[in-house]
């Protein structure tokens, strides 16, 4: 007797993630599930798809990211990444939670219902990230626990407050326990940690990390028992340095992540498909690269029947014509071929900017006979170098120039104050840039060499309700982000176009080869080495305390 199924896929080279090879075989799909891999004479399909000799892989999975870094809502983000073969992501809504607390998480969950992209949320573990900055909300364990009743919540996101774990902070330990009690798992954030410190994380149950910047760090995490998310984002370009650590013997412990990637970069180079392409270009067997991007990611996140193309697995897949270019795959999610979906953007209520800055506020008194502590940008990385250098001082005040810019972080929720410092690496000849995206508390952050333009940039953020600004001698270019000062209410095509205009405006005052806004956003993140700035001042990661600009 013949059984009727939904789809028969034939004439394809289909990835076998268990034996790390492509087979000339077939798939039989019924509703959202793969019924059988191989030839069957007793099955009949309502629909047949001839792959034309193309390559079929499981839907690609992003192991760790922040949707907000794309400046898009979850539903709009889905429209951007699904055409790249992405069918599932693990998102930490830390950014919007830092601004709007529980209501921010609820907003992300609700908006995600408008996209066929499978979005698993990891609950933000550290809001605020440390006690060294003011955020728009504080989330304790009791605020997060109810979310574990939501199927789309997969665990606790990157635990980044190492001192809280090491000192057995009761609230942090409760957050970890609540995740484990709910049958979920806990992601790590182990930037700059020693092997001894990694052991502290592992011993409380943290089992993944995405902060490796090179092969040595990746192997340290592997030896400690972590699953490693190989990061390749807009600023965090770590993959090439990590690839030498991956072998046939250990590949099952690696998956890919973008962490923070702009919509512009996703459209132009790709998402996880770019990570796969980069791995293949650097000598990795395509079967291994795609397995890392699919099955390994599902396993790291404790998902069953996800990430493989065989009997009983969910029918998420991508069809590529060849493995050399990985261009515009045909994508199936849950047994349905993807077509562009419609969505409606809703506002996030009760979000406004509450800060004030004047030129006298951002003046930086210094002694001309003393060196100053400098935040030194590391291009394409979110870490910085802490240097001590002579800087220009006139009449007792720091004077910014193309080498040394001024950087300011202003608390934007309750007008509690601001920090002022010096940053090297933006190479601005004039003007200023400003943003309401400043990890992780998302206060107002401004960098510039012209105080008038810096204040104008701050005032402009007020006027547009949050976003990103370039000011050049009074000429203003903006990208409004009305949803929490983090996300646009526009289609991704419009956001990309406006972002390109913003970058063009910045190119008129600087020639740096990296994304200035994403780089700027991480200059306020004190849990990443080495020297950062918050609304409370300069923060030394090694001392894990504040320091003054001059000793």
Curated annotation (Swiss-Prot):
It holds the Pfam family Adenine_deam_C. It catalyses: adenine + H2O + H(+) = hypoxanthine + NH4(+). InterPro entries: Adenine_deam (IPR006679), Adenine_deam_C (IPR026912), Amidohydro-rel (IPR006680), Metal-dep_hydrolase_composite (IPR011059), Metal_Hydrolase (IPR032466). Keywords: Hydrolase, Manganese. Its EC number is 3.5.4.2. CDD domains: AdeC (cd01295). GO terms for biological process: adenine catabolic process. Its cofactor is Mn(2+). One of its GO terms (molecular function) is adenine deaminase activity. It comes from the Bacteria. NCBIfam families: ade. Belongs to the metallo-dependent hydrolases superfamily. Adenine deaminase family. PANTHER family: ADENINE DEAMINASE, N-ACETYLGLUCOSAMINE-6-PHOSPHATE DEACETYLASE. This is Adenine deaminase. The lineage of its organism: Bacteria, Bacillati, Bacillota, Bacilli, Lactobacillales.
């Amino acid at each position: 007797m013949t059984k009727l199924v939904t789809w028969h896929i034939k004439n394809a080279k289909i990835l076998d993630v268990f034996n790390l090879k492509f087979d000339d075989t077939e798939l039989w799909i019924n509703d959202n599930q793969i019924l059988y891999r191989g030839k069957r004479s007793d099955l009949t399909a309502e629909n047949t798809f001839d792959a034309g000799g193309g390559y079929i892989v499981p839907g690609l999975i992003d192991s760790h990211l922040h949707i907000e870094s794309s400046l898009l809502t979850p539903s709009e983000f889905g429209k951007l990444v699904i055409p790249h073969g992405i069918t599932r992501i693990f998102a930490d809504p830390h950014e919007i939670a830092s601004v709007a607390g529980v209501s921010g998480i609820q907003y992300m969950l609700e908006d995600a219902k408008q996209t066929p992209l499978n979005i698993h949320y990891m609950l933000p573990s550290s809001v605020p990230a440390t006690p060294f900055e003011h955020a728009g909300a504080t989330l304790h364990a009791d605020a997060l626990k109810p979310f574990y009743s939501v199927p789309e919540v997969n665990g606790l996101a990157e635990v980044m407050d190492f001192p809280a774990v090491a000192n057995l902070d009761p609230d942090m330990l409760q957050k970890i326990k609540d995740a484990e009690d709910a049958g979920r798992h806990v992601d790590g954030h182990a930037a700059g940690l020693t092997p001894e410190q990694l052991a502290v994380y592992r011993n409380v149950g943290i089992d993944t990390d995405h902060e490796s910047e090179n092969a040595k760090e990746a192997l340290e995490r592997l030896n400690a028992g972590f699953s490693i998310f190989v990061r390749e984002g807009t600023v965090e370009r770590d993959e090439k340095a990590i690839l030498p650590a991956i072998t046939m013997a250990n590949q099952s412990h690696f998956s890919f992540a973008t962490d923070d990637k702009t919509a512009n970069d996703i459209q132009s180079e790709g998402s996880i498909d770019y990570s796969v392409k980069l791995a293949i270009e650097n000598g990795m067997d395509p079967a291994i690269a795609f397995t890392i991007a699919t099955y390994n990611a599902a396993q790291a996140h404790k998902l069953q029947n996800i990430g493989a193309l065989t009997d009983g697995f969910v029918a998420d897949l991508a069809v590529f014509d060849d493995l050399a270019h990985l261009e515009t795959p045909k994508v199936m999610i849950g047994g349905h071929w993807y077509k562009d979906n419609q969505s409606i953007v809703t506002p996030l209520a009760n979000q406004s900017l509450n800060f004030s800055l004047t030129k006298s506020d951002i003046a930086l008194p210094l002694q001309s006979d003393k060196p100053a502590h400098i935040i030194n940008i590391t291009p394409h990385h979110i870490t910085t170098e802490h240097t001590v250098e002579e800087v220009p001082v006139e009449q007792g005040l720091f004077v910014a120039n193309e080498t040394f810019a001024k950087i300011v972080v202003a608390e934007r929720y309750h007008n509690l104050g601001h920090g002022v410092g010096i940053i090297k690496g933006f190479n601005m000849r004039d003007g200023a840039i400003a943003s309401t995206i400043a990890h992780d508390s998302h206060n107002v952050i401004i960098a510039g060499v012209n105080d008038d333009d810096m204040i104008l940039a701050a005032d402009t953020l007020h006027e547009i309700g949050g976003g990103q600004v370039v000011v050049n001698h009074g000429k203003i270019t903006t990208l409004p982000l009305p949803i929490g000062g983090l996300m646009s209410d526009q289609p991704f095509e419009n956001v990309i176009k406006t972002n390109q205009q913003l970058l063009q405006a910045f190119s008129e005052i600087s020639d740096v080869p990296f994304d200035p806004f994403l780089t700027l956003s991480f200059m306020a993140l004190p849990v990443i080495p080495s020297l950062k700035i918050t609304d409370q001042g300069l923060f030394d990661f090694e001392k894990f305390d504040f320091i003054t600009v001059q000793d």
